C-alpha cells in the first residue's frame, strides 16, 4: 500500500454562491474575463466579500496547499502518495510525477481548470484528479498521524516506520471539523512543539524526517 501525505481541509474552493454578486468578486471576474463561479476563492482579492462566509477564518488561502505541494513533489522519494482533502470534503489525488506551476497565478488557473474538468491530463497520463472517495477510504489500512498543536511528542523513527497517512491541516486558522476527525477513524495526534506552526513548516519538518527514516531503512 505505501504511505500517503494528506492535506486536510485545504482552503481550495470556487467562489461560493452567497458572495458571487459582491462588488469585489464581480470586479475580479470582469478583470479576468471569467464568471464568478469559475474563480478560485482568494482572501487577498475577495477579503471584503468573505466577511459574511461561515468559517471565514479557514477559507480563501489556496497558496497554503500550493506551497506544501511544491515541497512534497520536489522530494526524490517516490514511496508515498499525495492527496488533498478540501474544506468541502472533496478528495484530490496528485500524481507524484506532476510538475506543478511554481508561479501562484498559474497554479490558480490550473486549479480552476481542475474544478471545471475534474481531471488534468498530459497525453494518456493523469496528473491531478478528483476522486469519488471519502477521507476514510484513503487513510484505510494506514497508521493515521494527525499533526496538531495539542498532540503528543514521539520519536519519528517509530512513527514513520510503516505505512502511514501523514495528515496536515492546510488552512490558515482554526481547528479541524469534528466530521473530519470522525472520517479519520483511529489516529494518533502528533505535535512538533508547544507553538502553532504553519502548514509549510510542518510539511517541511515531517518530510525531512520521513526521508531520513526511509533512507536509513533502505540503507
From Swiss-Prot:
What Enzyme Commission number does this protein have?
2.1.1.-
GO terms of molecular function: rRNA (pseudouridine) methyltransferase activity; rRNA binding
Coiled-coil portions = none
One BP annotation, GO: rRNA base methylation
Signal peptide extent: none
Identify the InterPro entries for this entry. Answer: Alpha/beta_knot_MTases (IPR029028), Rbsml_bgen_MeTrfase_EMG1/NEP1 (IPR005304), Ribosome_NEP1_arc (IPR023503), tRNA_m1G_MTases_N (IPR029026)
Question: Which catalytic reaction applies to this protein?
Answer: a pseudouridine in rRNA + S-adenosyl-L-methionine = an N(1)-methylpseudouridine in rRNA + S-adenosyl-L-homocysteine + H(+)
* Annotated positions binding S-adenosyl-L-methionine: 147, 169, 174, 192-197
Q: Which Gene3D superfamilies match?
A: 3.40.1280.10
Q: List the disulfide bonds.
A: none
Keyword annotations: Methyltransferase, Ribosome biogenesis, RNA-binding, rRNA processing, rRNA-binding, S-adenosyl-L-methionine, Transferase
Q: What class of enzyme is it?
A: transferase
Looking at the UniProt record, the site noted as Interaction with substrate rRNA sits at 61, 99, 102, 106
Pfam families for the chain: EMG1 (PF03587)
Q: How does it assemble?
A: Homodimer.
Give the family per the record: Belongs to the class IV-like SAM-binding methyltransferase superfamily. RNA methyltransferase NEP1 family.
Described function:
Methyltransferase involved in ribosomal biogenesis. Specifically catalyzes the N1-methylation of the pseudouridine corresponding to position 914 in M.jannaschii 16S rRNA.
Q: Tell me the protein's name.
A: Ribosomal RNA small subunit methyltransferase Nep1
UniProt organism field: Archaeoglobus fulgidus (strain ATCC 49558 / DSM 4304 / JCM 9628 / NBRC 100126 / VC-16)
Q: What is the lineage of its organism?
A: Archaea, Methanobacteriati, Methanobacteriota, Archaeoglobi, Archaeoglobales
Q: Gene of origin?
A: nep1
Amino acid at each position: 500500500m505505501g504511505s500517503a501525505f494528506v492535506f486536510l481541509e485545504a482552503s481550495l474552493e470556487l467562489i461560493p454562491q452567497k458572495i458571487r454578486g459582491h462588488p469585489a468578486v464581480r470586479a475580479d471576474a470582469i478583470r479576468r474575463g471569467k464568471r464568478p463561479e469559475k474563480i478560485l476563492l482568494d482572501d487577498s482579492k475577495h477579503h471584503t466579500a468573505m466577511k459574511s462566509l461561515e468559517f471565514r477564518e479557514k477559507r480563501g488561502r489556496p497558496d497554503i496547499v500550493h506551497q506544501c505541494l511544491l515541497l512534497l513533489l520536489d522530494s526524490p522519494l517516490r514511496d508515498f502518495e499525495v492527496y488533498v482533502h478540501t474544506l468541502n470534503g472533496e478528495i484530490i489525488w496528485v500524481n507524484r510525477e506532476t510538475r506543478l506551476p511554481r508561479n501562484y497565478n498559474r497554479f490558480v488557473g490550473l486549479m480552476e481548470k481542475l474544478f471545471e474538468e475534474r481531471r488534468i491530463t498530459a497525453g494518456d497520463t493523469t496528473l491531478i484528479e478528483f476522486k469519488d472517495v471519502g477521507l476514510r477510504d484513503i487513510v484505510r489500512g494506514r497508521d493515521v498521524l494527525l499533526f496538531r498543536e495539542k498532540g503528543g511528542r514521539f520519536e519519528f523513527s517509530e512513527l514513520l516506520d510503516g505505512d502511514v497517512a501523514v495528515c496536515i491541516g492546510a488552512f490558515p486558522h482554526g481547528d479541524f471539523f469534528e466530521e473530519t476527525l470522525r472520517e479519520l477513524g483511529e489516529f494518533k495526534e502528533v505535535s512538533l512543539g508547544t507553538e502553532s506552526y504553519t502548514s509549510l513548516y510542518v510539511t517541511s519538518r515531517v518530510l525531512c524526517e520521513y526521508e531520513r527514516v526511509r533512507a536509513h531503512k533502505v540503507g
